[in-house]
Amino acid sequence: MIQQESRLDVADNTGAREVMCIKVLGGSRRRFATVGDVIVCSVKSVIPGSEVKKKAVVRAVIVRVKQPTRRPDGSYIRFDSNAVVLVDKDRNPRGTRIFGAVARELRENNFMKIVSLANEVV
């Protein structure tokens, strides 16, 4: 579960390394976000020469969470890190590559471009 002030790794090649959640989108009193949710983030650290600059406010979709997520078949999925992929206002990824595995729940939330770029869907 991700909430305000949570720090997350960036799993794409936009140049951002780490972001901090500043808002969970989808309701005025919504506090937590999980895999497949869109959040608003502030970029905290970047790779030199990247297209995304430090302190930029960006949108991102959550692709991995440490908190175990229950699936309809009764199984649970858990990752080693909290990670996001930066997206634009139309929910298309800003980068051209995605590193690491992504959760299958992204397919249900119509993030097909992210699912197709990922090398592993768990």
Swiss-Prot record:
GO CC terms: cytosolic large ribosomal subunit
UniProt entry keywords in alphabetical sequence: Ribonucleoprotein, Ribosomal protein, RNA-binding, rRNA-binding
GO molecular function: large ribosomal subunit rRNA binding; structural constituent of ribosome
Keyword Methyltransferase: no
A Gene Ontology BP annotation from the UniProt entry: translation
CDD domains linked to this entry: Ribosomal_uL14
Keyword Ribonucleoprotein: yes
InterPro entries named among the record's database cross-references: Ribosomal_uL14, Ribosomal_uL14_bac-type, Ribosomal_uL14_CS, Ribosomal_uL14_sf
Subunit-level organization: Part of the 50S ribosomal subunit. Forms a cluster with proteins L3 and L19. In the 70S ribosome, L14 and L19 interact and together make contacts with the 16S rRNA in bridges B5 and B8.
Protein family membership: Belongs to the universal ribosomal protein uL14 family.
Protein purpose: Binds to 23S rRNA. Forms part of two intersubunit bridges in the 70S ribosome.
Protein name: Large ribosomal subunit protein uL14
The species this protein was found in: Rhodopirellula baltica (strain DSM 10527 / NCIMB 13988 / SH1)
Gene: rplN
